[in-house]
Amino acid sequence: MTAEQRRNLHAFGDYVRKTLDPTFILSYMAPWFRDDEVQHIQAEKNNKGPTEAASLFLQFLLELQEEGWFRGFLDALNQAGYCGLCEAIESWDFQKIEKLEEYRSLLRRLQPEFKTTINPKDILPEIAECLISQECEEILQICSSKGLMAGAEKMVECLLRSDKENWPKTLKLALEKEESRFSELWMVDKGAEDVKMKDLEDDEMKTCDVQIFYKEEPENQNLSQNSCSSSAPHTYSPLKPRKYQLELALPAQNGKNTIICAPTGCGKTFVSLLICEHHLKKFPRGRKGKVVFFAIQLPVYEQQKSVFSKHFERLGYKVAGISGATSDTVCVEQIVENSDIIILTPQILVNCLTNGTIPSLSVFTLMIFDECHNTSKQHPYNVIMFSYLDRKLGGSSDSLPQVIGLTASVGVGDAKNKAEATEYICKLCASLDTSVIATVRDNLEELEEVVYKPQKFFRKVELRTTDRFKCIISQLMMEIESLAKSIFEELGTITLGGLFQIQNSNFGTQKYEQWIVKVQKECAVFQMPDKDKESRICKALFSYMSHLRIYNDALIINEHARMKDALDYLKDFFRNIRAAGFDEIEQDLTQRFEEKLQELESISIDPSNENPKLRDLCFILQEEYHLNPETRTILFVKTRALVDALKKWIKENPKLSFLKPSILTGRGKTNQNIGMTLPAQKCVLDTFRTDKDNKILITTSVADEGIDIAQCNLVILYEYVGNVIKMIQTRGRGRARGSKCFLLTANADLIDKEKMNMYKEEMMNGAILILQTWDEAVFKEKIHQIQIREKIIRDNQGKPEPVPDKKTKKLLCKKCKAFACYTADIRMVEKCHFTVVGDAFRERFVSKLHPKPKSFGNIEKRAKIYCARPDCSHDWGIYVRYKAFEMPFIKIESFVVEDIATGVQTVHAKWKDFNFEKLSFDAAEMAGGAQDLGLQGMGN
């Protein structure tokens, strides 16, 4: 080891202390460390933590004089899994680790919410690559011995020390996969124009635009006349379609763009198979069709990929699928080219159209949109159709694919009458460029034998006359709000958007929870000059907001279930808080709860506090099972906490325990409520289908989204109402002959809303009938006019491009402030890459062979470039071969921009945020400058 290396290791010691747990590499350092030193380091970790242990380790390390210890240290880091730290020390470039600091800071301030929201066991497999193997084992051990909150705290501690540059994004993907509400707060974002540069730089291919839309998952049930249970093993055989399914498929098989609107449970998935098979077989020899089927959610994507594969691979067609979970590891262009049928989540195609991986929609001959009622606003479906309609209205000579939409309800939006409903449906048809709405008309009798429409009943019930439980919890919430207010007063003029705009009367509502989430998001991004104070304030506010959210949940449970269930929910939360090891704020909040606990216990067991809603629900269930002991029931509720509470109530109620309830919830997680995996959902449904003793299924909205559920003759909506589309879905669960559907609520407005939904359904059906009587040419002209109008609006709504700033500015190295180039020398390549022309710039950087050389289109990535100053070596970008030229591609995030006239300096994370005159690359400017990189000392 040289003296310079020793000095550097001492200088960069803070990075080692913040990252390394030395106990994980001590076994690899045995040749250099004495036993007493090893024991001293281990004791330091046990007593003071890994940072102090790393400091002691570094002290011993720098005192070593034996030959080879530095190489041994690097090898130990590699073997233990500290690859990022090892790479940084080898190159003395800690920029990648430094860039993680903003995410560490964000995670520190989000820690209170993380530990109350996340189940570490569920996301650990997804993020294990970002941790050391021993850390994963420690997290699991703590989960088992101390509980999930303590395990989540340990996971945060480990992530804060991770040296893996991709851990923030890996965590984001894991949270999204588990549909965790925490993912809304974990903000890891990249602009669309920068994605391509990142593709070249980091081999990442994702954008992260998250929007929430209503979804109806495709059903497997009633696919055909010889359909069988999804749980029964069988060899796939061709299915025989029903007459109404052939009727639904006919317009599409005749080549017309069509919306297929048919009830849940009738087998729309099977109809899409019929259309797809007919489409592929119609092409003459020498030509081939190419179908893309869009599914919005990952479970639906997986289900449809399986269904299409089983049906079409026996016919010799190649079926492939690409989702957000797989797009990083596959070549989208190649899969699309080599497959006959591609199942996609729609954002994948949006990304590919944006970056040019797929040049246009003309590569497809048929597009099928599942849940097509979502084709509005900025939903990926609509973005895809914008591209389609721009080509159509622009007179492109390229052939466009046939378009098919599938839905149980087209909806009517805010329509007040049949004319407005007709206009709304026409707009949906215009968005999908469809001139036919296919419904079952000639074979209604057969459809009604498959899908029965239940009778609808409304039950208005009363609330408790007095609610002491709510009064006590509301008082605790007001105290917490006061504590939070004192934090805001400490901030002085700095505010986060007005904490106290929500009145106490909103406790126990969804509106109050939305406000909590809003405050948490604002806390996550606000900044102060004093970073320690900023961290302390953010952490305190997150603790207060987390407790307010739990109390809010408890009030909702109390309103709709037993006080006992709400109290149990709170006790579970505080039990987990204690097991996790709480700070002073949490100790104070826990003490406040415990002071009221005895009174809450007494109130919760008082029979006079029984919930009138449960009394009425018990009466309905007893009455229906008395009339028909074979009744099968689905009970819809709003939240997972209510699912658990009502299950406990039924099991503990001697009048209802014979129902043997099972539960079905979604895959995401909220607070203490753990979501169900896809296999767990299937297991519940199979049991409900086959076990006659299991008479009631309690579920959230997941069951109105097309999951394959056995026929039921009783549907109960317990304070559960949505829009007209959701109403049709939930009602569709009552499929048995003679079915009944009850809406049970204490809120008269919900009954009015459901009646309005029924009226809107009539309007929708009437509007569809009107449109089906229109002459097709008239209908086409109508939607064409809508398309033209919408395109004009869309074009005019585009953000105006800022006037380019033509003043010349300097780019300085962000690390050492060395001069790099002038903006006048920067040229834009393919709209998203930026190079610098002129030989002078080549003297200001050095290069090293790229560890992952790769080609993308016209670009071959060859080397990394760094600031030429020996004491800097800051990462500036990459060196590429573009067509016939060798050139650098620089990253604006690596530089400081200085205004020559004023001396003002600014930084920009993305090129699109930097306003200057962006001149396009001209090959003539490269004359004489296209020397090979090897002449400049490749490998410097």
UniProtKB/Swiss-Prot annotation:
Gene Ontology CC annotations of this record: actin cytoskeleton; bicellular tight junction; cytoplasm; ribonucleoprotein complex; ruffle membrane
Residue span of motif DECH box: 370-373
Positions of modified residues (Phosphothreonine): T773
Reaction(s) catalysed (UniProt annotation): ATP + H2O = ADP + phosphate + H(+)
Location(s) in or outside the cell: Cytoplasm; Cell projection, Ruffle membrane; Cytoplasm, Cytoskeleton; Cell junction, Tight junction
Region Mediates interaction with RNF135: start-end pairs: 738-928
Gene3D superfamilies, sorted: 1.20.1320.30, Death Domain, Fas, P-loop containing nucleotide triphosphate hydrolases, RIG-I-like receptor, C-terminal regulatory domain
Function: Innate immune receptor that senses cytoplasmic viral nucleic acids and activates a downstream signaling cascade leading to the production of type I interferons and pro-inflammatory cytokines. Forms a ribonucleoprotein complex with viral RNAs on which it homooligomerizes to form filaments. The homooligomerization allows the recruitment of RNF135 an E3 ubiquitin-protein ligase that activates and amplifies the RIG-I-mediated antiviral signaling in an RNA length-dependent manner through ubiquitination-dependent and -independent mechanisms.
Protein's recorded name: Antiviral innate immune response receptor RIG-I
Provenance organism: Sus scrofa
Taxonomy of the source species: Eukaryota, Metazoa, Chordata, Craniata, Vertebrata
Primary gene name: RIGI
